[in-house]
Amino acid sequence: RQLTGRILDEADILLVFGPEHREWILAGHPESSERVLALGQAGAVLSLLPHGVTIPWWSLAETVLARRPVPRPEDWIDDPYGRGEHAARITAQAITDNLGLLADRVSWDGRAEPSGLSSPPR
């Protein structure tokens, strides 16, 4: 799906692969800065949580930005297009690993408050 202003406005978290994605979003929607995370940035922070500990989805961006406010070069996932099968495998593994951390270490229960602020489940 094409990313639109409406999607950006409605999204609680925006996970991007490359710095060009983050820069493109922030150029047009600077107010989104606290919701835009590199997938690898989120994965790196989540990997540091003790085994069995999860965080609620509504605190993901805040947790990641508190521990790793700026994505590091290793947080970006390279586009493998035109770089061969080996590059595609590396990219697929990075995506799989980071999504696995999101699935294992983030609780996706809860809801957003009408004000747009997120709150824990009651």
Show the residue positions of the predicted features.
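Short polar/charged helix/loop
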Residues: 1-122
